[in-house]
Amino acid sequence: MTPTYPLQRLFASLTLIAAFVWPLQRAHAEGQVKIVDQYGIGSLLLKVAKDQKLIEKAGARAGLDIDVQWNTLSGGAAVNEALLSGAGDIATIGIGPLMTIWDRTRGRQDFRAIAAQSAVPVYLVTNDPRIRSIKDIGEKDRIAVVSVAVSQQGRLLQMASAQAYGDANYARLDRFEVNMPHADATTAMLSGNSVINLHFSNAPYQYQELEDPKIHKVTSSTEILGGPSTGSVVVTSEKWRKDNPKTYAAVRAALDDAARLVEKDKAQAAAIYIRQDGSKLSPAFVERILNDKDTSFATTPQNTLQLGAFLHKVGVIRHEPKSWRDYFFADDKNAQGS
């Protein structure tokens, strides 16, 4: 049976409260946008846009005064609920949750990605020396993820399980997963005295965990997907995009501006991340992550189709994506994504 935690109950309550803090209108005048972000370096482009007011600046260049409202949630399931309820217009989610919301809203709200944000590898880490591969995980083990099965990490774990045990057993490890925000999971892992002995993490938390010599990496998104891949995207609905073309264009331009800033000045980007996430990490530590050879921040997606094809093959989504353009808005006809 999956254990429960006071922090989980508190988080669930806060998620529900957050969904009602903002007005639930689905349509409004140009110049207003409600954005839901998540914690972590994966959504650095939105954090840079917020910190530097890049959306407002892009709007001003087009003669539009934009009021941006921000909220932060944890996990793709909570964020998808915020989008579907109208509590958010635009949000950060992983490729797994993107496939889910794209599949389920086709022909209705038609949620798709505006742009990629980052290709930052995510690691499955453990503090148990016994566990060296997926096949070593058993009944006594518990894996912390932000949303059981449906998060980006949950979907990657399903893909790894299918690779190890066959497609019919893709959900074999789901029953060992526990809902827990990354920060709490990191604390549990570092304590060494929690029921949690694995964490499918993200940046910067996985790097903090690996600073402890008792913690090691079991696998990663890079290994599961066979190379670097976009893990975080920015999404909205076709309806919101059509109803707010100028605001949408400002958001899209701001993401490109943010990507250029990150590419040009990693030190400034690290400082922005620390400021926006309220992180206690040192600027040098964060900058080292941003300079990792396997990490990149670009608005064109990389190696995303493979996960979508897998989710269709095992029956998680009904519609098979044939191209990355199926679940991304076609704003740049010349973009060479994958």
Label every model-predicted segment.
Residues 2-14:
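Bacterial N-terminal signal peptides that target proteins for export
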Residues 15-17, 27:
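Cleavable N-terminal signal peptides
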Residues 22-29:
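Sec/Tat signal peptide C-region and signal peptidase I cleavage site
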Residues 31-170, 175-179, 193, 197-203, ...:
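Short, glycine-/small- and polar/acidic-enriched structural segments
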Residues 44, 118-124, 215-216, 230-234, ...:
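Small-molecule pocket liners
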Residues 166, 171-174, 178, 183-274:
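Pocket-lining segment of extracytoplasmic ligand-binding domains
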Residues 241-318:
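Secondary-structure end/capping motifs
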Residues 311-338:
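Conserved C-terminal helix/tail region of periplasmic/extracytoplasmic solute-binding proteins
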